[in-house]
Structures are given as C-alpha cells and as structure tokens.
Amino acid sequence: MLSPDDIEGHLDALQRIGDRAAEARADYEFSGDMLRTVYAAEYLKSELPRAADKEAEALASEAYRKALEDRRNAFVVAEKLRHERAWRERVIDAWQTMSANARGRIL
C-alpha cells in the first residue's frame, strides 16, 4: 500500500507541475504564432516571381525548419508534463480507493 509520505510527494509534485505545465502550454501556443510569423517573413524575403515558388522557398528555409523544431520541442515538453500530472492523479485516486476500502474493513 502507498504510504502517506508517498502521497504527499505526489501532491507536492502536482503543485510544482502546475506552473511548469502552464508555461509549457504557453510556449507551445506561442510557437504556433512564431511558425506563421517565420513563414511570412521567409515568404516576403523571397525574390522568386511565382507564389508557389515563394511558398516552397519559405517552407524549405532554415528559419522555418528551426521554428518547426521549436514547436515540436514545446509540444513534447507540454505532453510529458500532462502525462506526469495524469499519472500522479491516478496514483492518488488509487490511494484514496485503497484507503476507503481499508476503512471499511476496520469497522
């Protein structure tokens, strides 16, 4: 059975995860805006005559690739924190259930 110290550790971690998860989510949302901004800047920088060529050049640019990589990394961080939060919540739920069942047997 889980000890009260284990549960306290999970609760403390949940509290710490909250701020980090909010920042990670904000970074992910911001990276989407940056991706569009970088694309537009690269598109406008192109000296090619056709729109399709400008688009291809913008999408193939190093700046766009970097912005895309930053977005992916932000998503990974946000998802890892979301997963950790969910896992810790399930551990606490299991402890609550086990504690309730144990109280029922004691009476």
Please describe what each predicted stretch is.
Residues L48-V77:
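Short, glycine/alanine-rich amphipathic alpha-helical segment
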Residues A24-A56:
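Extended alpha-helical coiled-coil "stalk/arm" regions
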Residues I17-R20, A41, S61, R105:
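Surface-exposed polar/charged interaction patches
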Residues D12, A58-L59, D93, A100:
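Short amphipathic alpha-helical "recognition" segments used for binding
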Residues R25-Y28, G32, R36, E69-A102:
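Long amphipathic alpha-helical coiled-coil segments
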Residues L2, I106-L107:
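Terminal, low-complexity, charged helical segments
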Residues M1-D19:
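Short, charge-rich amphipathic alpha-helices with coiled-coil/heptad character
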